[in-house]
Amino acid sequence: MAGTISIRKSIRWIPGPACEPTRTMVLTSPQGRFVDVRVLKKGEGDGAVDGAGASDRSGHLPFARLDWAIAGTSTSTIVRTPDETIRRCRFEHWLDSRTATPDAMPPDEGDMFPLADGMTLEKGRMVNPDTGVDTDYEEVWRDESVERGTEQECVVLRYDGYEDEIGHDVDERRGMMVKLGGHAQGFIKSRGEMAVGRWKMADHEEESEAGNEAGNEAEDDKQRLRCVVRMGRVDWLPSEQVFARRFSIGEQLQVGPLLWVVVEAV
């Protein structure tokens, strides 16, 4: 399986109309590890309406603008019915910004249907965060091509905290970073705080959520990176390093106090 860069174009809570209140991107590695970041557009949500949704001068967005962040693994199976063949995807949440216990959440599954314009229609059922009620939904996704011009096509790093000598959690943080082509997304969370980031090479054209609102481009000039989204302690995430060189599986990378481990490299 190849890695995928998926951009959501719309979501529809049945029977309502389709809309897209977020800038949603999912980076999925060839082995199915993913980081899914959904940021409310400026003007969406209570925080943005009352002014709390604007970024500060450093380019950081407030967590009022975070709709959802997820990291985990995905698998797909083929389901055949008398009428059609369906690709059913299952998403295992290892990290989830909406809950401290993602393992206890109901299965996250969606059925995928190809559309004539090359996009994908996903159908499923999940809790509508606006109502708190399980609701049928439809999402439309567009996949971008994965550029091959970067140092390494895909690298995935994971941080899983550590325990003391008698098995007590000393650091409860968990994190995942996926770099795919010229894009990268990272998500790290503990019980008390979290950080979410999205980066891309400077010659890509997508607008920066932070740069457009803060009056600066929020660029990391040294690495020619553009930070599209930054929330919380993004210095915990290996954003510059994943673009700087090639990595091997099992390699360890120190980022501040955190020792990340490479779990996938292509």
What are these regions (language model features)?
Residues M1-A69, V79-V266:
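Lipid interaction determinants
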